[in-house]
């Protein structure tokens, strides 16, 4: 009998093993016609999606590996069964995410363990949900979409070092840890930084480094980065982050105020970057400084 996969997996069980075709994953370089990622507005999304019935479905093919024993937390409730998680992954794939490594990572990370128990029943709907401090955990589709775009690089998807701006509860960092060799994540709100540490500690994720600080400044002591991903929207991407990208590196960020778009920025040379717009989105605002 094949053992079922659960998080945490060893990095080698996903990274560098999924088959890839010769072609790079196609990235839409113009705004999609009328497609808007579900807003990162927790109250609105909870009311819209909170009663949705999730029907288990088979996701796109993903690598399967031997698994660690399930935690007592996971065994305790049918709401967090593997079938429900697979239904989420299948829905993300149906929305257009094709990268098998990204889908495998989404399938492996237990999203319900990164939010309050009262919201566990909503953990696998395609919506952002509150995590405290007026912040949210991003909807599954947008997490997968941004990571897929970041991986579609000139190195065939290899990500040696990634920077995340806005750790939040730690969920996206956990997903990133399965597709990148090293993950650095910055959170400006002290309470969320501590929450992410508490969430990730029992999962024994060895390749994540969490930092408390101003994400708009980046992390120059660990630069350069093959990929940078922002979980909050500014009017523009801070120059400090652009300068911390490797040549050929990719940065994915929401940009805008009332109307926001997901933007891809690629570093072409030491003094040249090119950008393209992917689709509409809605995130919490990017702010400077720190909150104790």
From Swiss-Prot:
Catalyzes the methyl esterification of L-isoaspartyl residues in peptides and proteins that result from spontaneous decomposition of normal L-aspartyl and L-asparaginyl residues. It plays a role in the repair and/or degradation of damaged proteins. HAMAP family: PIMT. It is an enzyme of class 2 (transferase). Its main location: cytoplasm. It comes from Janthinobacterium sp. (strain Marseille). It holds the Pfam family PCMT. It is found in: Cytoplasm. It comes from the Bacteria. The active site is at residue 138. This is Protein-L-isoaspartate O-methyltransferase. The gene is pcm. The keyword Transcription regulation does not apply. Keywords: Cytoplasm, Methyltransferase, S-adenosyl-L-methionine, Transferase.
């Amino acid at each position: 009998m094949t053992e079922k996969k659960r998080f945490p997996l060893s990095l080698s069980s996903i990274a560098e093993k999924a088959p890839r075709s010769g072609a790079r994953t196609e990235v839409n370089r113009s705004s999609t016609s009328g497609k808007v990622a579900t807003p990162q507005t927790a109250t609105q999304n909870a009311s819209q999606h909170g009663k949705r019935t999730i029907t288990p479905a088979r996701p796109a093919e993903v690598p399967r590996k031997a698994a660690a024993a399930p935690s007592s937390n996971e065994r305790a409730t049918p709401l967090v069964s593997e079938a429900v998680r697979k239904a989420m992954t299948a829905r993300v794939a149906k929305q257009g995410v094709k990268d098998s490594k990204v889908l495998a990572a989404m399938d492996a990370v237990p999203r319900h363990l990164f939010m309050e128990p009262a919201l566990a029943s909503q953990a696998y709907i395609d919506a952002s949900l509150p995590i405290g401090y007026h912040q949210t955990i991003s909807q599954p589709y947008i997490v997968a979409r941004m990571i897929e775009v970041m991986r579609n690089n000139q190195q065939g998807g290899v990500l040696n070092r990634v920077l995340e701006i806005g750790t939040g509860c730690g969920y996206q960092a956990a997903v990133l840890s399965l597709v990148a060799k090293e993950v650095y994540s910055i959170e400006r709100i002290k309470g969320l930084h501590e929450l992410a540490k508490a969430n990730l500690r029992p999962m024994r994720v060895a390749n994540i480094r969490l930092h408390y600080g101003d994400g708009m400044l980046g992390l120059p002591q660990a630069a350069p980065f093959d990929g940078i991903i922002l979980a909050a929207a500014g009017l523009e991407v801070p120059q400090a982050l652009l300068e911390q990208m490797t040549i050929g590196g990719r940065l994915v960020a929401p940009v805008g105020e009332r109307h926001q778009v997901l933007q891809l920025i690629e570093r072409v040379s030491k003094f040249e970057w090119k950008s393209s717009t992917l689709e509409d989105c809605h995130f919490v605002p990017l702010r400077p400084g720190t909150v104790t």
